[in-house]
């Protein structure tokens, strides 16, 4: 078992039972990644592994992007680990404040790495990628903590995104 798989198991992120996922699919296990992203030791490990993935894959980024809410701690931690600024992507505009979909400084032509907690179908990631591209950003990569292997990799490939998970669900849930 990898160091990350062990850390996710130890912090209680991996749960077994009957669950409905954000995609609507049913599952006999659930990965409560917020148990990991609110644990400083596990969050630090995730940031370190994401930074290593960036280096090993040669991923260059001017900005890191996290989708509100679940991916923001990951984007923050990776930003602190790498020194790369981050932006937050809202799922929908708010009717108060600035009403922006993208919070933080983003400039046309910026290379943006999207980070995600768990990818199943990649629906929310693809929406965020479209939002970033409409703002003039270049998005080529998504790094996630978990790939639930629910078609997300293929869906991301369809929008010209290279997907790099830290761990696949099939590796994590081996019992």
Predicted regions and their residues:
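PRPP-associated nucleotide enzymes
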Residues: 1-115, 119, 123-175
